[in-house]
Amino acid sequence: GDEIQVRGGGVGLSAADYEEVTIMNTSPRFLKAMNLSERAGKLRIPVAKIILGKIMGSGVGSGNCHRGSLDIQATSPEMVKEYSLDTIRLGDVVAVTDYDATYGARWQPGAITLGVVTHGSSYASGHGPGINVIMTSPSGVIEPIITRKANISEILNLP
């Protein structure tokens, strides 16, 4: 049979001083490049946009956020306008409030989940721009800091 070799970087990553933060689907190189900081017991992380958990769609209730994407519902033109969803770009790092992805995707007041936008919008009900989770905290110890430079291409200096 054929032989393959799989190399993984970042599998099992954790934030030493933040036990309630789960890191997934990312690499040590990307985390270092994100310029994380700490203040008042919170892990401050640059994000391009903050999304309300109540507008999340496809993926809610999934049992595993280590694969697949979670969609921001964008089928309603009114919702797109109200939440400026048309400004989301591929590669943006976004924060989802009141949303925990530690052991699957679920609504939880006070939780924060971070993800990278990996696909565009959709006309299918409950779908829209999709994010792959990179970090989550059920206790909200993550503090998102808005900056338009929070995009994977800027963070990693990609052409």
Regions picked out by a protein language model, each given a short descriptive name:
Residues 1-159:
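Conserved mixed alpha/beta catalytic, RNA-binding, or beta-rich assembly cores of soluble enzyme
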